[in-house]
């Protein structure tokens, strides 16, 4: 048995796993989809370095293929002058070689009608020089060249041993390992989807899995020695040490080894990594697990598979044995690598297979020598042909190539290797340069009338790109003034909805709310028992039943059949009919004010009494009607230690003193009627609501941050947004990211309720924000799949405003239909000529059609993030591609509001942008593939087919159309309207944003209103004065056309 680990070793293992997991992107449950940069763990590096690291870690593409960029360039979406300038800058770093014009050579590579790299890895410069000179490949140690180097580079000591064995013996150990781990994860992490659940999950992942694995007969029959391994390592950290020592992996390689193991299933690892840090996640508290558990399970399985393979196939049982095989049987290893892992040359498979099966060492050596020579020749010829094509396109004489020699060929290959790495970033910068010019060309200096006219209504929308169309159309159809603000309206809340038993965080994922808001029926009186019961959910982990127990299985089946037919054949009409069957949601209001200590104490007392009643019934069989309030009070006081002596249980019910004492102890420990838990409950209840000062601060901050501090309209609309679609696991990805993947209605209701309070307005008046008595804040919801806006809490609307309500609704309705008419052609290219009414009906039908894989494009197409006054872009059509954050630097003398905008909305916007970028450039590795093959896993994620890694990122239907990118993967272009030095100080003050700007994860523009709107762009490590390219007029917006 492994010796008990000392504390230092335990901490070292945990720390190593923690660091190894940094490249693993976090994965939130699908029901609250959170956009996230897949390379978040690499954001400390500059963008270009991070994507190169990710290419190796995720085995993924990080830029689009060259031919796609060429297509964009032909459509006018790239700045040719910028591309030529970047190419020329790179050419200056190349060594001078007689006869080679590097600018023309690299331009020829750029224009080649192929996605192939100009550089062939492992092609020898000496061999390439011979090919170009028309000579034979030189003799020499063929074994020591090319193929040998490729094999050793592919099998480093930190690569998982299962993969290494697969590479030489053609086994399937790594895939088998993935399958076993996924099955174990499904069993443990299931959230009431499966009919069978792993027992003992409260112990934690590794302990529960180990208990099951010890008794798993199928593994025993297969010959997997799981039990023997577990006997050596009862704890997860001990198991990791035992396996790594058994495999002979040197400790200096553990971190890299762990990273590779975790990234094999980065979806599951990312979910567990998020889950272990989510303190309020119900399932995480109930069934704990962390990446040490996950890695331990994986490594134990890996060791068992490796040992089984060693027994049956005579493969190495550890890394030292594997390395010995590479050294002592290099010829055999080379042939095995060529057959199972390398790029096998045509016509060699049967010869190598026969030799490995039946031949002696001498024949294997000769075959390896012959194959290596042929491998060298093929790679050299391939590289030579590429160079000849480039030379022909660049106008370089053939004689120049023939005269290169080995040294010259090495210099050429080194330049092409560097260019192959950097070419993608060159294309990216050229496209971004054109996009920057396109944005700046539409900017106008906002008009500031001396006496501002009072608009009919002001509307605060989420900064989400899908709000841009609706805002623009609303301003065009009527006297509306719109603003952009983060969709949680600056108020982070935990929310407990009516009839719900768990809390939802309505704020960005990087924020943890301190305050809790309850939704309660308007009919409930504060002193009633129902109200106390509602608050009880705050203190207990309760879950609602998914299907009512009063409905029979047959009835469910019949209703499901109706659903299937209705949602497919007539989705809109069926939705209207079906909604009549659902119980109506009662009229509710939000509990926003803090509870007094007396109110909180009465709630705790009521809950304690309820728990004692339950204890009497469950533990002693004494029903409620047999006890009165005085008896319950006596038991409560005894349990809390406020009184001593015998209780009614002895006097009235004849219990022995021993049984009475045991019952009181059960009430204290099991039912938690004790002083310490009462204090905890009081702290929990203290989270409910906001103090008056908090409410004033949140309203002041929200209004000031967007520049709305005077000239209020009668209506101030607070429009959150959400989505509606059928049969869509990714529905929450279409909701509000600023609200933690939920819709924004509750956040709108919270701020509206605060802003409408007379006490709040009175205090706001003292700090410079005077909201007129005839102004009313109205919450609403923009459903992005249908482009509709519905207003809420109109029952509270003052009677004097009712006369204007129809005008308000008509304006919103007209804007909705115009927005639908813009959006439908992006979904259905054949529907370009639809009238607004027709388009509006089509999007409503699509949102209720459960066969629809793309009810909307969501945030696909996002490109810009504008921080400034609405007047900058009010006359521009940004085609639903821009986040629009209202901001007036003149109301922010210290820059604190700008810092908050940068630290919050801009960072979230960058997450959204990067999620779309990487899901587009490689949907297989960074995205989640096609929805068609998705199955829900455990109610928190999706898999491809029945068993796979959890699919992270966005599905193909969100970012691709007909196999080509719909979303144009460019970095987020952030434009800030503020004086240059003022904006720079704000950026410097927020460390995360400073890193993103300097690392070029976002492209940043400062638009200085004190210098006649002069633009400064951060590039090459400095702020540069920017002038719009003369060729800007050729830019087109393909995203909104077929």
UniProtKB/Swiss-Prot annotation:
Co-factor requirement: Zn(2+)
Pfam families documented for this protein: DabA
Source species of the chain: Nitrosomonas eutropha (strain DSM 101675 / C91 / Nm57)
Subunit structure: Forms a complex with DabB.
Membrane-topology annotation of the record: Peripheral membrane protein
Record's protein name: Probable inorganic carbon transporter subunit DabA
MF terms in GO: zinc ion binding
Residue sites binding Zn(2+) per the record: 462, 464, 721, 736
Keyword Cell membrane: yes
Subcellular location: Cell inner membrane
Record flagged with keyword Isomerase: no
Function text: Part of an energy-coupled inorganic carbon pump.
Keywords: Cell inner membrane, Cell membrane, Membrane, Metal-binding, Transport, Zinc
Family stated for the protein in its record: Belongs to the inorganic carbon transporter (TC 9.A.2) DabA family.
InterPro entries on file: DabA
């Amino acid at each position: 048995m492994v010796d008990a680990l000392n504390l230092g070793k335990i901490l070292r293992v945990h720390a190593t796993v923690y660091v190894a997991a940094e490249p693993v992107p976090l994965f939130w449950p699908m029901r609250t989809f959170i956009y996230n940069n897949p390379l978040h763990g690499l954001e400390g590096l500059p963008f270009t370095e991070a994507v190169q690291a990710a290419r190796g870690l995720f085995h993924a593409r990080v830029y689009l293929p060259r031919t796609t960029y060429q297509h964009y360039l032909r459509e006018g979406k790239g700045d040719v002058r910028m591309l030529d300038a970047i190419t020329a800058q790179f050419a200056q770093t190349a060594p001078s070689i007689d006869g080679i014009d590097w600018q023309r050579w690299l331009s020829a590579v750029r224009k080649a009608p192929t996605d192939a790299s100009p550089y062939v890895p492992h092609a020898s410069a000496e061999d390439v020089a011979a090919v170009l000179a028309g000579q034979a490949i030189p003799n020499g140690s063929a074994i020591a060249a090319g193929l040998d180097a490729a094999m050793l580079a592919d099998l480093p000591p930190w690569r998982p041993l299962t993969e290494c064995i697969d590479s030489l013996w053609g086994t399937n150990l790594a895939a088998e390992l993935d399958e076993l781990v996924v099955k174990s994860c499904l069993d443990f992490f299931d959230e009431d989807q499966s009919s069978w659940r792993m027992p003992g999950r409260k112990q934690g992942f590794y302990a529960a899995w180990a208990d099951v694995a010890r008794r798993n007969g199928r593994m025993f029959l297969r010959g997997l020695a799981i039990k023997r391994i577990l006997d050596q390592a009862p704890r997860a950290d001990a198991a990791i040490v035992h396996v790594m020592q058994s495999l002979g992996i040197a400790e200096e390689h553990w971190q890299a080894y762990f990273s590779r193991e975790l990234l094999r299933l980065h979806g599951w690892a990312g979910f567990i990594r998020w889950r272990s840090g989510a303190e309020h996640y119900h399932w995480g508290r109930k069934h704990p697990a962390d990446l040490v558990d996950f890695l331990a399970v994986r490594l134990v399985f890996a060791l068992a598979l490796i040992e089984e393979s060693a027994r049956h196939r005579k493969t190495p049982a550890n890394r030292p044995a594997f390395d010995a095989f590479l050294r002592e049987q290099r010829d055999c290893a080379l042939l095995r690598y060529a057959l199972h892992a390398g790029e096998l040359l045509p016509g060699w498979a049967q010869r190598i297979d026969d030799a490995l099966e039946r031949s002696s060492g001498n024949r294997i050596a000769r075959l390896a020598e012959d194959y290596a020579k042929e491998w060298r020749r093929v790679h050299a010829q391939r590289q030579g042909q590429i160079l000849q094509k480039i030379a022909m396109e660049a106008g370089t004489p053939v004689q120049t190539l023939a005269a290169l020699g080995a040294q010259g060929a090495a210099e050429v290959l080194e330049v092409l290797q560097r260019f192959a790495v950097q070419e993608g970033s060159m294309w990216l910068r050229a496209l971004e340069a054109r996009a920057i010019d396109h944005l700046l060309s539409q900017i106008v200096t906002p008009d500031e009338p001396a006496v501002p006219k009072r608009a009919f209504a002001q509307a605060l929308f989420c900064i989400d790109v899908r709000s841009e169309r609706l805002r623009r159309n609303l301003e065009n159809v009527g006297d509306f003034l719109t603003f952009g603000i983060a969709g949680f309206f600056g108020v982070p809340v935990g929310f407990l909805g009516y009839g719900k038993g768990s809390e939802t965080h309505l704020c960005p994922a990087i924020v943890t709310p301190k305050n809790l808001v309850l939704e309660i029926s308007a009919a409930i009186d504060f002193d009633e028992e129902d109200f106390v019961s509602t608050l009880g959910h705050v203190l207990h982990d309760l879950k609602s039943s998914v299907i009512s127990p009063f409905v029979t299985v047959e009835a469910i089946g019949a209703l499901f059949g109706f659903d299937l037919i209705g949602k497919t054949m007539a989705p809109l009409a069926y939705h209207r009919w079906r909604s009549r069957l659902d119980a109506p949601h009662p009229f509710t209001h939000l509990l926003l004010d803090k509870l007094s200590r007396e109110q909180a104490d009465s709630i705790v007392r009521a809950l304690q009494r309820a728990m004692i009643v339950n204890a009497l019934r469950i533990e002693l069989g004494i029903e409620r009607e047999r006890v009165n309030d005085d008896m319950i009070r006596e038991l409560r006081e005894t349990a809390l230690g406020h009184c001593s002596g015998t209780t009614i249980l002895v006097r009235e019910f004849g219990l022995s003193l021993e049984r009475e004492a045991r019952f009181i102890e059960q009430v204290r420990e099991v039912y938690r009627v004790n002083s310490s838990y009462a204090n905890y409950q009081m702290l929990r209840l203290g989270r409910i609501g906001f103090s008056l000062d908090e409410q004033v601060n949140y309203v002041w901050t929200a209004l000031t941050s967007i520049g709305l501090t005077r000239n209020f309209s009668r209506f101030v609309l607070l429009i959150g947004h959400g989505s509606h679609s059928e049969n869509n696991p990714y529905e929450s990805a279409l909701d509000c990211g600023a609200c933690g993947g939920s819709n924004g209605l509750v956040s709108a209701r919270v701020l509206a309720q605060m802003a409408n309070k007379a006490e709040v307005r009175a205090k706001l008046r003292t700090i410079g924000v005077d909201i007129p008595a005839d102004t009313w804040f109205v919450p609403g919801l923009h459903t992005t799949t249908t482009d509709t806006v519905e207003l809420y809490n109109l029952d509270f609307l003052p009677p004097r405003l009712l006369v204007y309500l129809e005008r308000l609704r008509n304006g919103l309705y007209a804007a909705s239909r115009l927005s639908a008419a813009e959006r439908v052609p992006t979904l259905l290219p054949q529907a370009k000529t639809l009238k607004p009414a027709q388009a509006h009906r089509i999007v409503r039908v699509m949102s209720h059609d459960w066969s629809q894989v793309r009810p909307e494009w969501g945030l696909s197409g996002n490109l810009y993030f504008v921080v400034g006054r609405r007047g900058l872009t009010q006359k521009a059509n940004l085609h639903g591609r821009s986040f629009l954050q209202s901001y007036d630097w003149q109301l922010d003398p210290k820059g604190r509001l700008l810092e908050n905008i940068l630290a919050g909305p801009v960072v979230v916007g960058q997450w959204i942008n990067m999620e779309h970028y990487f899901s587009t450039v490689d949907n297989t590795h960074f995205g989640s593939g096609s929805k068609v093959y998705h199955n829900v896993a455990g109610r928190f994620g999706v898999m491809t087919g029945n068993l796979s890694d959890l699919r992270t990122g966005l599905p193909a239907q969100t970012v691709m159309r007909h196999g080509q990118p719909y979303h144009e993967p460019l970095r987020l272009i952030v434009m800030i309207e503020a004086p240059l030095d003022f904006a720079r100080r704000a950026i410097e003050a927020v460390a995360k944003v400073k890193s993103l700007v300097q690392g070029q994860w976002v492209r940043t523009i400062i638009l200085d209103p004190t210098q006649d709107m002069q633009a400064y762009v951060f590039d090459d490590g400095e702020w540069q004065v920017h002038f719009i390219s003369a060729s800007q007029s050729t830019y087109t917006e393909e995203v909104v056309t077929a």
